[in-house]
Regions:
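Structured catalytic-domain cores with a bias toward divalent-metal coordination
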Residues: 2-252
Length: 252
């Protein structure tokens, strides 16, 4: 009798555990946070331009206005070649201090291309509201618009070559020889070899695989392995490349 109850208890635990895993997987696959009830500011919202070409033209127009107001304004455009898009540039605008130079502000946007609309909006707001006569009397400003224009245009974080620009800038080539020893542990987990498919077995088992890996190696080392950036897996995430990106070479 005791053995029978033990078996029943064990089966009940297995069923409860299976249900818990099923619920966790379902919530993981269907998670969608509710949008907050915030009334957008129409004037501020107008600054956000989703498409790269439109944002670039808006930046150039603001540059025209500043060039008409201030002296010795310099402008440049660095073309960025692409096999998938055209008309890509890193645009620069330099407004020197108009009277007695004491400091220089450098502002860039779109290092992670998909963040470009927000960065462009903030840049143009800065141009409209902060680049006035008083501020520019002793302070110069250098603006760099869309460091990663391909990512901006294609709504991708990385460049066309999958390079994370935030981990690409280096004073010497030693950076590109950096060994991220922990990254191979997580590469197979976070970079599936098959096209994305929410119904695939590897997706359904992702949570269990992740929990097992955390239990084996610890959250800290795994987080460090991912966020540190890596230079050995060109198709992996946070890939820093093997040399300066062409637009950074031009800026250097």
């Amino acid at each position: 009798m005791m053995l029978r109850w033990l078996w029943r208890g064990l089966l009940a635990l297995i069923v409860v555990a299976a249900l818990g895993v099923a619920v966790a997987l379902w919530r993981f696959a269907n998670y969608a946070p509710a949008d907050p009830a915030i009334a957008p500011d129409a004037a501020a919202q107008a600054l956000f331009i989703d498409d790269y070409a439109g944002a670039r033209q808006a930046f150039l127009a603001e540059g025209d206005a500043l060039a008409a107001r201030f002296q010795r304004v310099e402008r440049f455009a660095i073309p960025v070649a692409s096999a998938q898009a055209s008309g890509l540039f890193v645009d620069g605008l330099y407004v020197p201090a108009q009277q007695s130079p004491k400091r220089l502000i450098i502002m860039s946007s779109g290092v992670h291309g998909v963040e470009g609309p927000a960065g462009s909006a903030v840049t143009r707001l800065f141009m409209q509201e902060f680049m006035g006569e008083a501020a520019l009397a002793d302070t110069g400003v250098l603006l760099l618009h869309a460091i990663n224009p391909y990512g901006f245009a294609r709504q991708r974080r990385f460049t066309e070559q999958n390079v994370d620009m935030n981990r690409n800038a280096a004073q010497t080539n030693a950076l590109y020889l950096t060994d991220n020893a922990g990254y191979p542990l997580v590469d197979s987990l976070i970079n599936p070899t098959q096209p994305a498919d929410l119904g695939a077995v590897q997706h359904r088992l992702f949570l269990l695989r992740a929990v097992g890996m955390i239990g084996q190696h610890g959250m800290g080392p795994l987080r460090q392995a991912v966020l540190q950036g890596q230079y050995a897996f060109p198709k992996g995430i946070y890939y820093g490349g093997g040399a300066l990106a062409p637009q950074l070479q031009a800026l250097a």
